[in-house]
Amino acid sequence: MEASITVSHSFQCHPRDALRALCAALLTSAATSRNSLASSTHAAPVWRWAFSHSAACASLACWVWLMTCRASSASVAMLWASGSICSANSLMPLDFFTLSIAFMVYCLPVFL
């Protein structure tokens, strides 16, 4: 069952779709590069988008439970470009931890 979460901003996005794209990009990156996923030039832009998106969203539950968030990639890109989101607040260990859990939960069936 997929629920909806309303957070303090008024953008629209579906983390389930974002995680599907992230999973596909990382699997493609793994197939084309023998480097670690985190340092791969193919995966780096995807990771940066995912981290900035989670930093822009006030609800970490969006990532953990794959619920509907309300932040669009275009809005996140605008926030990133304006400096509202920077690497200091988008690469927080907690965001990385919750994103990792969501990624593993969503992509687990791919590996089984």
UniProtKB/Swiss-Prot annotation:
Q: Which keywords are on file for this protein?
A: Plasmid
Please report the name of this protein according to its UniProt entry: Uncharacterized mobilization operon protein C
Q: Please name the source species.
A: Escherichia coli
The lineage is:
Bacteria, Pseudomonadati, Pseudomonadota, Gammaproteobacteria, Enterobacterales
